[in-house]
């Protein structure tokens, strides 16, 4: 059998032509306060750095959520449909999904991620470890366009369980989070479920340390986005002319990650387009909203889902919510 036949199925639902994606990126950089969509963090190097972030002492979300899952895995699995289609949104290296396979016994694993090459290697590793399990990779900017109806309809007797761990939902503005969860709801039918992690409100010092670690890994991750922009736009950002900045905004209840210009300079963004940065000028790269448990339940309800079960840690730092169609 050829190597190609051994590889798991890989599909793409990317909708915008590359030129339109570039135009959106350029428009964000030309706003009065420049913006770069956080999806551009995740080139191959960015994925590697984020994996490193998840191992940091300061970055509590990963280990706290992992402990909640470890302590409650069987109880959570007992609330899920039998032999579901396990849909891992933003699956990365698929490590979190691997930990669920024995407990959930899915009929199929669907890994969804925007980083195509990284996704292919990740889903192939799952397929190699579980040769009897159907594994499908979907290259998708799923935060904007979730289009899995046809794929899920191939197995009408296996309802989907959407798995969205890691508090990534916090990267959306609350209204955008509602619209995103509504798109998940539209894929659930009557029996589908959403298993989602959300970071909870806590003291500012703990939050800020998680996004500005002493060893500088998060800073490297944030600065790497400029290398991605250079590749996408043929721009000439020099990352060394910016520094990482992360603070908690009390009014909006969110961490804000930015890049701050160290000095006045100019950047070529496109062939005939330049952007001038003054010293101290910011580029917004990420928001991470924090919720109380009740606020997040209300968000699920506004999105057409009912929270049926909730698990947290001893300190109430992180919440895992299981929701079904309302």
Write out the residue ranges for each language-model feature:
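N-terminal auxiliary segments of SAM/dcSAM-dependent transferases
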Residues: 1-40, 47
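Class I SAM-dependent methyltransferase Rossmann-like catalytic core
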Residues: 34-80
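Conserved class I S-adenosyl-L-methionine
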Residues: 83-92
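Conserved SAM-binding loop of SAM-dependent methyltransferases across substrates and taxa
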Residues: 93-105
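Conserved SAM/SAH-binding beta-strand->alpha-helix loop
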Residues: 115-116
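A short glycine-rich, Lys/Arg-flanked "PGG" loop and its adjoining helix->strand segment in the class I
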Residues: 178-190
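Conserved beta-strand signature within the Rossmann-like core of class I S-adenosyl-L-methionine
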Residues: 187-201
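Substrate-binding/catalytic lobe of Class I Rossmann-like enzymes that use SAM or dcSAM, i.e.
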Residues: 208-289, 297-303
